């Protein structure tokens, strides 16, 4: 049995995620690590309860606990590197309000590597926890991380602006940072959904286009230069240009990949397997190379390939600042890029166009591995004469000779299978997507009938 997926532990409250589990994870972290642990939480209704259980587990092992309380995940990672030997974040990121979860960080701000997560699971399942003597149990110390974190981002970005920016915080923890960061940069900030509320009353927390499409109209009505949207724990960023057009996540990645490769005169960019061909096109043209890695492991890719930049959809890592996903650095650098090079609508014209479609197929967790394998094998047979490369990390990514690709992978956080297709034309994309989606849907039904 696995507790950790591609983004830590995540699941529905009381079904998978409970105070008992949080306490055991805390006990396991305190057994695996020693010294100080920085603990934070997002704004979900269950996060205070789970944070307190986590703290109890950590204290029981003798660790000293620093309580950052309500904080965005990137700020928790930064604070861990500055203050502690380990970090723990109570969050379910962009999941529905019924869910919650746990992310664990090393003292350098990296998320726990897969082998470390397996180590925690072994400790939890064995019950072999360290138990502190009565005189080893330390008091909890409350710490304020956010002001110093904002200053660190400001220093790193090193730019002042007079842009007008619309910010949508998804009623999440990012609302404690982004409006203040942008204002300190000199921007005129207009905010929506910027009060923290674990019910997520403004919109669904995931910043997919369908959840934030209304921002395009607001951009045009308010005359802003840029709109930024985040998720519940503020590790994701989505953007609209000054004309109200949504800038898809691969284009944002491609803009930054191009920037870093040009600055370095080459270098390696690591991206997750669900990213598109436009990234390869701009990186190779600029003299760099792209390496695709499993989902949830950009920090591992940075270390393994000495990467100058890493990204997943909506999640960008700026290694010079830190080895964690940091959208606050992203928004600061994006504003700098716009000020120095022109409107975002013009910048994206430098990125080649590919057409992407994605959807989820509901699938019970126990069938996901079989369904993904069978569906990928069937799609490979149908496209055998066109295949350029097949990557079998975090699922199956089937790349074709014309630059098209199909991805079939199990979700690491939900009972779903992700299906993605991208191609140079909409017609080709639709053909590939329909083939993959219908194949996965049929095999799920067959598996459920067994």
Curated annotation (Swiss-Prot):
The modification Phosphoserine is found at residue 93. The active site is at 93 (phosphoserine intermediate). Catalyzes the conversion of deoxyribose 1-phosphate to deoxyribose 5-phosphate. Also shows weak activity with glucose 1-phosphate and mannose 1-phosphate. Could be involved in pentose biosynthesis. This is Phosphopentomutase. One of its GO terms (molecular function) is phosphoglucosamine mutase activity. Activated by phosphorylation. Belongs to the phosphohexose mutase family. GO terms for biological process: carbohydrate metabolic process. PANTHER family: PHOSPHOGLUCOSAMINE MUTASE-RELATED (PTHR42946:SF6), PHOSPHOHEXOSE MUTASE (PTHR42946). Pfam families: PGM_PMM_I, PGM_PMM_II, PGM_PMM_III, PGM_PMM_IV. Mg(2+) binds at residues 93, 231, 233, 235. Homotetramer. Optimum pH is 7.5. The keyword Protease does not apply. Optimum temperature is 90 degrees Celsius.
């Amino acid at each position: 049995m696995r507790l950790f997926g591609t983004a830590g532990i995540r699941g529905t409250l009381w079904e998978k995620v409970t105070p008992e589990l949080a306490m055991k994870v805390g006990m396991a972290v305190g057994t695996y690590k020693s010294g100080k642990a920085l603990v934070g939480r997002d704004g979900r209704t269950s996060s205070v309860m789970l944070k307190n259980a986590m703290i109890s587990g950590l204290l029981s092992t003798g660790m000293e606990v620093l309580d950052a309380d309500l904080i965005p995940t990137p700020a928790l990672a930064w604070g861990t590197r500055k203050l502690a030997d380990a970090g723990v974040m109570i969050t379910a990121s962009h999941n529905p309000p019924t869910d919650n979860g746990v992310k664990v960080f090393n003292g350098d701000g990296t998320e726990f590597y897969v082998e470390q997560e397996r180590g925690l699971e072994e400790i939890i399942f064995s019950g072999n926890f360290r138990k502190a003597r009565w005189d080893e149990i330390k008091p909890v110390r409350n710490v304020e991380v956010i002001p110093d974190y904002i200053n660190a981002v400001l220093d790193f970005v090193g730019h002042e602006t007079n842009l007008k920016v619309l910010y949508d915080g998804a009623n999440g923890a990012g609302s404690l940072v982004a409006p203040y960061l942008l204002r300190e940069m000199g921007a005129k900030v207009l905010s929506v959904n910027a009060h923290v509320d674990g019910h997520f009353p403004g919109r669904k927390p995931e910043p997919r286009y369908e959840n934030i499409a209304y921002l395009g109209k607001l951009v045009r009505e308010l005359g802003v230069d840029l709109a930024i949207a985040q998720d519940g724990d503020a590790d994701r960023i989505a953007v609209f240009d000054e004309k109200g057009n949504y800038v898809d996540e691969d284009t944002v990645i491609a803009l930054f990949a191009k920037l870093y490769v040009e600055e370095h005169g080459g270098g390696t960019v690591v991206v997750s397997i669900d990213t598109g061909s436009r990234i390869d096109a701009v990186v190779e043209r600029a003299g760099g190379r792209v390496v695709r890695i499993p989902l949830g492991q950009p920090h591992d890719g940075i270390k393994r390939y000495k990467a100058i930049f890493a990204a997943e959809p909506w999640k960008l890592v700026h290694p010079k600042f830190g080895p964690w996903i940091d959208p606050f650095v992203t928004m600061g650098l994006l504003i700098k890029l716009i000020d120095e090079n022109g409107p975002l609508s013009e910048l994206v014209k430098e990125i080649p166009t590919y057409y992407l479609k994605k959807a989820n197929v509901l699938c019970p967790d126990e069938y996901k591995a079989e369904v993904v394998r069978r569906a990928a094998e069937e799609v490979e047979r149908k496209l055998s004469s066109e295949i350029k490369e097949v990557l079998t990390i975090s699922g199956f990514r089937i790349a074709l000779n014309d630059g098209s690709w199909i991805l079939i992978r199990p979700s690491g956080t939900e009972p779903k299978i992700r299906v993605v297709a991208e191609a140079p034309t909409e017609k080709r994309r639709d053909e590939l997507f329909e083939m993959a989606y219908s194949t996965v849907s049929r095999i799920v039904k067959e598996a459920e009938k067994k």
